[in-house]
UniProtKB/Swiss-Prot annotation:
One of its GO terms (molecular function) is ATP hydrolysis activity. Zn(2+) 2 binds at residues 367, 370, 385, 388. InterPro entries: DEAD/DEAH_box_helicase_dom, Helicase_ATP-bd, Helicase_C-like, P-loop_NTPase, PriA, PriA_3primeBD, PriA_3primeBD_sf, PriA_C. It comes from Rickettsia felis (strain ATCC VR-1525 / URRWXCal2) (Rickettsia azadi). This is Replication restart protein PriA. Initiates the restart of stalled replication forks, which reloads the replicative helicase on sites other than the origin of replication. Recognizes and binds to abandoned replication forks and remodels them to uncover a helicase loading site. Promotes assembly of the primosome at these replication forks. GO terms for cellular component: primosome complex. Zn(2+) 1 binds at residues 358, 361, 398, 401. Its EC number is 5.6.2.4. ATP binds at residues 144-151. PROSITE patterns: HELICASE_ATP_BIND_1, HELICASE_CTER.
Length: 648
C-alpha cells in the first residue's frame, strides 16, 4: 500500500506515515492537511513509501487551498540544516512554516511592481562594482567604507531581478535597521517591501506566506528567520552588515543565519551578496582562499571625507565626581552644537549603572538566578538582570550587613550619560536609543525621524545605533568607553571591538561638515585603536588571521560546543566529565569541561566542552557517535552549538 511520509512543523518530530486517498494526487513538497492527535495540521509531503499493511495509519485529508507547495530547494535546505546543526527535521520545518496557513478564505499579500524605477546615478567606483557583481558566479562581498553607497549598489541589482520577475530577500541583523532602508526602497521602486520579523502578527504571517508561496510577494526585508521563507522564485539574497553577531541564533536551533542564507542562495541558484564596512574574519578568509569574490569601495559617496579619529587618554583626565565625559569631549560637543550640528554619544551598556555594592561589607547585588550583576535602572527604580529579566527593587540599606547609607553604584550606563548630558547642555534636545528606550519598530522609527528632521541635538545610543544609519547633519561621535569588551577572554573580542568602533565612527561626517570621532580610553596604546585611527582594516584582518592561525582556531579549524546545564551543579559537572572520559579517539582536540562564562543562567548551572577539529573533519558524525555512547539523564539539558560565536 502506498503511503506518504509527512513532515509536520513541530519540534522533535520526524516524518510520519499517512495513507494517500485514491482520489488524491500528491508530489514531493506539496502542502497537505493531516490529522495529528486531536487536531489537524499542515504538513509537507516529504517522501513516498510502500508498505504491506497500513490498517492503523491515518489518512491525508486534502491539499491546502491553491495547491501550494514547497520547492525542492527549500526541502534541500531543511535536510542540510537538520544535518549540519544536528536538529530535528520537525523543528526546522517549523522555521519554514511558523504558522498554519491551511485556513481559508485568506487574503493573499501581493506587491504591485512597476518596472519604471527611479534610481540615482552611480559614481564610477559604484558602476565598476555593479559590473563585477553582474559577472560574478560566487558569493560576493561589497566591502566599502561607511557611507560609500553599498545600499545603492545592491538596489541596482534588485532592479535587474525585479525586471526578470524574480523574488529578492534583503537580510538585516536587526529589524530596527529597516526604517531608513524601507523609506529609500519605496522612494526608488514605488512599492513597499514586505517586512518579516518577530513583531509581525499571526494573521500577517499567513498572508505573507501565502503571497510568497504564490510568487505574489517579490521583495522581503527581514531579520534572521526570513531566510527560511518558502520562496518559489528566489533570484537575489542580500546579507547586509554580514559581520553582525545578531545573525547567530543563541536559543532554540543554534544556527548562523548568514551562513545558512548563503547555503539557501546556493540551493536556489540565487545571487548572493554580502555587505559590510567591517567584514567578519571568516568572510575575509573565504575571499583569500577564492571561495568568495570581493568588491571594494574606498571612497564615500560624493567623495565626502572620512572622519578624523582622536583618542583621549583618560588616565590624564581629571573628571569631577559622577562625571564620565572628558573636558576635551565636552568642549568638542559645545563647539559642535554652536555650529548647529548633531552629536552622537555611544556607550554599549544599558541602564544607569552596571553594579550596586555596599561600601561597608562589599556585598554586590547579583541575580538570584544567574551569575551576573544586577544592573541599576534609575528610570524604572529597579535592579534588573539583562540575561534572564529578573527584577528587584532598589534597596535603601544593605540586605547583607543591614547598614544604612552604605550602598553605592559603580560605573556608567547609558541613563547616567543621559543625566550628565542634560546637566551640561540643558537647552539642547537630548534623546536615548536602546532596547529599554525603543522597544518596538514604531518608537525607533519615531526617533530616527526626529534625528533626520534635526529635532534632536544629542543622541545617546547603545550598539543599536551603530548599524547603517545615515544622519547627514551628525558630525561628532563620542565613544564614552572604548575599552569596553576589548579585554575579555573571548576569541572574537578584538574583532568585535574593531568592528564596533569603526561602525560607530562611521556615523560621523556623512553630509556637509567634516566628521570627528573621540574615543575615551584608559588604555590608549591598545593596538586596536591604532588600526581604527588609521582606518586600516586590512592590516587588522591580517594580524587577526595570524593570531587565529597560530592558535588553530576558526577560520583555520572548525569548532563545536557541547553545553550541559541543570539545577544541580555537581551532577552536571559529573556528567560533563564522564562525557570527556568516554570521548572516542579521533584527530580532534577536546577542551573542558569548563564552567561557561555565564556559569549560571535562569537558575541552571552551565558547563561547556569545546571540540576543535580540522576543516575537513566530519564533526557532526563524530558528535553523533559520541552522544550514542552515553545516556543523558532527563535533569540535564544538552545543547550542541556548531561554529559557536561566543562562549557565554
Amino acid at each position: 500500500m502506498r503511503i506518504a511520509k509527512i513532515l509536520l512543523p513541530a519540534a522533535k518530530l520526524f516524518p510520519l506515515d499517512y495513507l494517500i486517498p485514491e482520489s488524491l494526487v500528491l508530489n514531493i513538497g506539496d502542502l497537505v492537511i493531516v490529522p495529528f492527535r486531536s487536531k489537524e495540521l499542515t504538513g509537507i509531503v516529504w517522501e513516498f513509501a510502500t508498505i504491506p499493511e497500513a490498517s492503523k495509519l491515518k489518512t491525508v485529508k486534502e491539499k491546502v487551498p491553491l495547491d501550494l507547495s514547497i520547492t525542492s530547494e527549500v526541502l534541500e535546505l531543511i535536510k542540510w540544516l537538520s544535518s549540519y546543526y544536528m536538529s530535528e527535521l520537525g523543528s526546522i520545518a517549523k522555521l519554514v512554516l511558523p504558522i498554519d496557513i491551511a485556513e481559508k478564505p485568506i487574503k493573499v499579500k501581493e506587491q504591485k511592481v512597476n518596472n519604471s524605477f527611479v534610481l540615482p546615478d552611480l559614481s564610477e567606483e559604484q558602476k565598476q562594482a555593479v559590473t563585477i557583481l553582474n559577472e560574478s558566479n560566487k558569493p560576493t562581498l561589497i566591502k566599502g567604507v561607511t557611507g560609500s553607497g553599498k545600499t545603492e549598489i545592491y538596489f541596482h541589482l534588485i532592479a535587474d531581478y525585479l525586471v526578470k520577475g524574480k523574488q529578492v530577500l534583503i537580510m538585516l541583523p536587526e529589524i530596527a535597521l529597516s526604517t531608513q532602508i524601507i523609506n529609500r526602497f519605496i522612494e526608488r521602486f514605488g512599492f513597499e517591501p514586505i517586512i518579516w520579523n518577530s513583531s509581525v502578527t499571526k494573521a500577517q504571517k499567513k498572508m505573507i506566506l501565502r503571497g510568497i508561496l504564490s510568487d505574489k510577494v517579490k521583495v522581503v526585508i527581514g531579520a534572521r528567520s526570513s531566510l527560511f521563507l518558502p520562496f518559489k522564485n528566489l533570484g537575489l539574497v542580500v546579507i547586509d552588515e554580514e559581520h553582525d553577531d545578531s545573525y547567530k541564533q543563541d536559543d532554540g536551533i543554534l544556527y548562523n543565519a548568514r551562513d545558512t542564507a548563503i547555503v539557501r542562495g546556493t540551493f536556489d541558484k540565487a545571487q548572493i551578496v554580502l555587505c559590510s564596512a567591517t567584514p567578519s574574519i571568516e568572510t575575509m578568509y573565504n575571499i583569500e582562499i577564492g571561495k568568495y569574490q570581493l568588491v571594494t569601495l574606498v571612497n564615500r559617496y560624493n567623495n565626502v571625507d572620512l572622519p578624523n579619529i582622536e583618542i583621549i587618554d583618560m588616565t590624564k583626565e581629571k573628571l569631577s565626581k559622577n562625571s564620565y565625559l572628558s573636558k576635551i569631549l565636552i568642549e568638542a560637543i559645545k563647539d559642535n552644537l554652536d555650529n548647529k550640528k548633531q552629536v552622537l554619544l555611544f556607550l554599549n551598556r544599558r541602564g544607569y549603572a552596571p553594579l550596586m555594592l555596599c561600601k561597608a561589607c562589599g556585598h554586590r547585588f547579583t541575580c538570584k538566578f544567574c551569575s551576573s550583576w544586577m544592573v541599576v535602572h534609575k528610570a524604572t527604580k529597579k535592579l534588573e538582570c539583562h540575561h534572564c529579566g529578573y527584577q528587584s527593587k532598589i534597596f535603601s540599606s544593605c540586605p547583607e550587613c543591614l547598614e544604612d547609607e552604605t550602598l553605592t553604584i559603580c560605573g556608567p550606563g547609558i541613563e547616567r550619560i543621559e543625566e550628565e548630558a542634560k546637566a551640561l547642555f540643558p537647552e539642547n534636545k537630548i534623546a536615548v536609543i536602546s532596547k529599554d528606550h525603543a522597544k518596538n519598530p514604531e518608537r525607533i522609527a519615531q526617533l530616527l525621524h526626529q534625528m533626520e528632521n534635526l529635532e534632536i541635538d544629542i543622541l545617546i545610543g547603545t550598539q543599536m545605533i551603530t548599524k547603517g544609519y545615515h544622519f547627514p547633519n551628525l558630525t561628532l561621535v563620542g565613544v564614552i568607553d572604548a575599552d569596553l569588551g576589548s579585554n575579555n577572554a573571548d576569541l572574537r573580542a578584538s574583532e568585535r571591538t574593531f568592528q564596533l568602533l569603526h561602525q560607530v565612527g562611521g556615523r560621523a561626517g556623512r553630509g556637509d561638515g567634516k566628521g570627528v570621532v573621540y574615543l575615551q580610553s584608559y588604555y590608549p596604546d591598545n593596538i586596536i585603536f591604532s588600526y581604527v585611527k588609521a582606518g586600516d582594516e586590512d592590516s587588522f584582518f591580517a594580524n587577526e588571521l595570524e593570531i587565529r592561525k597560530s592558535a588553530d582556531m576558526p577560520p583555520f579549524s572548525k569548532t563545536a560546543s557541547v553545553i550541559l546545564s541543570g539545577s544541580n551543579e555537581s551532577k552536571i559537572l559529573e556528567i560533563a566529565r564522564a562525557m570527556v572520559r568516554i570521548a572516542p579517539k579521533a584527530n580532534v582536540k577536546i577542551l573542558g569541561p569548563a564552567s561557561s562564562l555565564m556559569s549560571k543562567l535562569a537558575g541552571k548551572y552551565r558547563y561547556r566542552i569545546l571540540i576543535i577539529a580540522d576543516k575537513k573533519f566530519n564533526l557532526q558524525k563524530y558528535l553523533k557517535f559520541w552522544l550514542s555512547l552515553i545516556k543523558i539523564p532527563s535533569f540535564c539539558h544538552l545543547k550542541i552549538d556548531i561554529d559557536p560565536k561566543s562562549f557565554y
